[in-house]
Amino acid sequence: WAKAGFRWIVNDAEHTQWEGFYGRDQNAIKGRLGLLAVQRLHREAISSYGDAYQLGARATMRPYGCTFEDAKIFFKSINFPEPGSPTPHDRGGYPVRNGDRTMNFTPVELRASETETQGWIQFETSEYLIDRKLRDKILQLMVAQGRNKACGFVGPLDVILRQGEIPEVNEAINDFFREATKLGIHTGRVVGSGSMEDPKDIEEGMVEAIKNGARLLSVHPLTSDMTLRGAFEMAAPFFRASKRCGF
């Protein structure tokens, strides 16, 4: 994957349950190859977000948010509490071992041990994409997390599933990219689908997203499909040659 140019991989525990929870070994392998490990979790998750960081994921993804409170709880769940003002959703404290086998036994050491992590919010419901007022409020919450600490990612399938084929979805997505870019927030989307398989169409979709400010672009096939798709690609010349020869 890394040699093909991929830079981040999402492990989807929202829809694949335990198979989608990557452990220390899988995350370490990706980290050594320069791949950002993004752990997507089920919408009910709270404690699991902090646990994912301890297992080596460097980013976590919150799907299907519909309210400002959903986003607020997510960012609480990936951060340790502020001294004197904890909430029920903050990460809990426990001794954590560093890669060099040293331990972090104090709150100061614990906070200092983990700085290069991100929280990704998925903008994939009509509440987050179509409702501009709520969207902008969440973007401001993301800004408050600090530079490069929060990213936004669009999966438009859920909007269409919930609302139907509404014409304003694509413009709402592009407007989201533009507004987030003004605030210094990195955003992205899946480009391609079962009804959009032509590489030329996918390329045009990626160009449109990039021009509107998106920087985190994802292909639509699952990584588990890459071997099959690669095999099809390698076998294709044989079948074209056979057809030309009358077989």
Each PLM stretch: what is its role?
Residues R58, R62-N148, F153-L161, G246-F247:
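Conserved anion-binding
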Residues K3, E44-R58, R62, E69-F74, ...:
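Catalytic cores of alpha/beta
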Residues A2-Q26, R62, G152-E171, P221:
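Glycine-rich, proline-tolerant flexible connector loops at the mouths of alpha/beta enzymes
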Residues H15-Q17, R43-A45, Y64-C66, F123-E127, ...:
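Active-site-proximal loop/turn and secondary-structure-junction residues that shape catalytic pockets
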Residues I9-N11, A37-L41, A59-R62, G119-F123, ...:
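Hydrophobic faces of well-ordered beta-strands that scaffold small-molecule active sites
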Residues V190-F247:
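C-terminal active-site rim and adjoining tail of enzyme catalytic domains
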Residues C66, K133, E165-A172, D201:
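Alpha-helix N-cap and loop-to-helix initiation/capping positions
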Residues W18-D51, S77-P88, G92, N98-D100, ...:
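Alpha-helix-loop-beta-strand connector modules within alpha/beta enzyme cores
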